[in-house]
Amino acid sequence: MAVDPVQERSASSVQSLLRALDLLEALGRLGDSRLGELADEVGLHPSTAHRLLGTLCARGFVTQDGRSGRYRLGYAVLALAQDTGKHTGELRVIARPHLDAIRDACGETVNLVVLERGRAVCIEQAEGTRRVRMNMELGRGFSAHSVASGKAFLAYAKEWRAVLGRDEPYDRLTPRTKVTGEELEAEFAAIRASGVSVEQEENEVGVTCVAAPVFSTSMTPVAAISVCAPTTRLLEMQSGLTRLLRGHAVELSRQLGHSLLTSPEDNGARTLKSDFDRASESSRGAGS
């Protein structure tokens, strides 16, 4: 069978793009580097690395010292990073009142999470008022397949396997972690149907999390709002909490320009109050 020249050129272009991205990531890890060091780091022939670096230099993503010949990241990368930081900063500011309102209703720590390279990363947090509370470390990444916030992203991804960047079975972090595509596909369908993601002790034994996706102008989530708590405590207030998260996620999405979501009739605040009061009474003796 003859090879389609258009498809062949397309495959070659994708390969070149991936190699160029590998070089950028290598420069980010290594800092100023010689051609040979970079080629070895990413497994390329020096001539191929030199050609790709030349293109990146021409676009300002990489610069080369004229005397030493060493390469470093260019100002175009910094400009992109500043744009990303600006977007993230705006998102945090707009989301903050919602995080505070949810925290005030349930007493638990509330997280604003984004997806970075297949990992759920907390970028903002309203710390809970409970003596025993579950906090996501700011800036730390968690495997998206094992946490509620990560699943809230994956459920809407066209190619969620590519987002994870790994082959199944995925890492089993606890006995309850879902590690096969079949298990995750079923869960993602349920998340899309309900608008919320519930993860029970899949990332850490004894901890359960609930999350709701936040959208901007498309059906691809730009963030997720999540609450994590000791399993017994969270399950006792799950009904009201999921509805409360969903209501705030819908409102935040509208503020970010989304218009396709509908808000539930009851945002969950009343249900959550009775659930939370019951959970507080049952856990008071345990010193929670």
Map each language-model feature to its residues:
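Short, solvent-exposed recognition segments
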Residues: 2-3, 131-205, 271
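Short, structured helix-loop boundary elements
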Residues: 13-17, 70, 74, 88, ...
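Amphipathic alpha-helical regulatory segments at dimerization interfaces
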Residues: 26, 41, 93-105, 194, ...
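Amphipathic alpha-helical effector-binding/dimerization core
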Residues: 67, 72-168
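Short, solvent-exposed cationic patches
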Residues: 144-150, 239-259
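Extended hydrophobic
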Residues: 176-251, 268
